From Swiss-Prot:
Record GO terms (molecular function): rRNA (cytosine-N4-)-methyltransferase activity
Keyword GTP-binding: no
Keyword Transferase: yes
Family: Belongs to the methyltransferase superfamily. RsmH family.
Protein's recorded name: Ribosomal RNA small subunit methyltransferase H
Organism annotation: Dictyoglomus thermophilum (strain ATCC 35947 / DSM 3960 / H-6-12)
Lineage: Bacteria, Pseudomonadati, Dictyoglomota, Dictyoglomia, Dictyoglomales
Enzyme Commission designation: 2.1.1.199
SUPFAM superfamilies, alphabetized: Putative methyltransferase TM0872, insert domain, S-adenosyl-L-methionine-dependent methyltransferases
Location(s) in or outside the cell: Cytoplasm
GO cellular component: cytoplasm
Keywords: Cytoplasm, Methyltransferase, rRNA processing, S-adenosyl-L-methionine, Transferase
Gene that produces this protein: rsmH
Enzyme class: transferase
Function: Specifically methylates the N4 position of cytidine in position 1402 (C1402) of 16S rRNA.
Reactions performed catalytically: cytidine(1402) in 16S rRNA + S-adenosyl-L-methionine = N(4)-methylcytidine(1402) in 16S rRNA + S-adenosyl-L-homocysteine + H(+)
């Protein structure tokens, strides 16, 4: 368990706990449970009262989180599903409302360092999988080997905002005629041909685009957000941590669309401290937004 805690440092933990406005007896959802970094502290704040509901689509991660949370006194229940099933989960628990919900988007350090599923361009030997759940139909390799040139180009532009998306898509289609994509290294060979080495870090955008497409991340997130105003109790809080502009745009649009029900608690986006960024590189691109369920107007 010490290894799990060393792998995963929860981003903006102090800010999350503060803005969730926790107290004993509340019902709290961690929609992106991961390895339970945030949830561990949430459970402590509930002090044996109330309920923590944790959701994660990755069965392997959920198992590790369960082990971690079981060492803390408190009530929790975990669900191995996508977080757009919020209303169904509450129905199963005979609950109508919750008091707080957290979304910490993206993927965890575990997925990069321990999953062996090809989430990072730093692991050329890993298979091009990128699925959070084995129930997901398509792998990253499937997409690279079957999508048309225009579909690939649109994917890299829409989900990765990659300026060389057309050139990259063309090269991928050419390459797969001779050799199918199977490993991270196969994709890196093409990226090296298309994206200048001074922009090597830009491979991140390509991997981001594939990960989002494989797991349908943005659509699932939108569907989940649309349920929040109807399950959050009056005065309840929603806290969202995003890591790139596509996610953040969805959150901003959500607050705008539901301004009659959700009131931003902070007008400005909240960012991690310089100290945290030094200690945890994953926090460097994090943006936290928080809203509160208002009285029905």
């Amino acid at each position: 368990m010490e290894e799990v805690e060393s792998i995963h440092k929860p981003v903006m933990l102090k800010e999350v706990i503060h803005y969730l406005n926790l107290s004993p007896g509340k019902i709290v959802v961690d929609a992106t449970l991961g390895l339970g970094g945030h949830s561990s502290e949430i459970l402590r704040e509930l002090r044996g009262e109330g309920l923590l509901i944790g959701i994660d689509r990755d069965e392997e991660v959920l198992k590790l989180a369960r082990e971690r949370l079981s060492k803390i006194a408190g009530n929790f229940v975990l669900f191995n599903t996508t977080y757009d099933n919020l209303q169904n989960i509450l129905k199963e628990l005979n609950l109508s409302f919750i008091d707080a919900i957290l979304f910490d988007l993206g993927f965890s350090s575990f997925h990069i360092e321990k999953s062996g599923r090809g989430f990072s361009f730093m692991r050329p030997e890993e298979p091009l999988d990128m699925r959070y759940s084995k129930d997901t139909a398509l792998t990253a390799a499937d997409i690279l080997n079957t999508f048309s040139e225009s579909e690939l180009s649109n994917l890299f532009w829409e989900y990765g905002e990659e300026p060389l998306s057309k050139k990259l898509a063309k090269k991928i289609v050419e390459r797969r005629k001779d050799k199918k994509f199977a490993y991270v290294g196969d994709l890196l060979e093409v990226i090296d041909e298309v994206i200048p080495r001074r922009r090597r870090h830009e491979a991140t955008k390509v991997f981001q685009a594939l990960r989002i497409a494989v797991n349908d991340e943005l659509n699932i997130f939108k569907r989940a957000l649309e349920q929040v105003p109807f399950i959050l109790s009056i005065g309840g809080r929603i806290v969202v941590i995003t890591y790139h502009s596509l996610e953040d745009r969805i959150v901003k649009n959500f607050f705008k669309s539901y301004s009659d029900k959700i009131l931003p608690v902070s007008k400005k986006v909240i960012k991690p401290s310089i100290e945290e960024i030094k200690e945890n590189r994953r926090a460097r691109s994090a943006k936290l937004r928080v809203g509160e369920r208002r009285e029905n107007s």
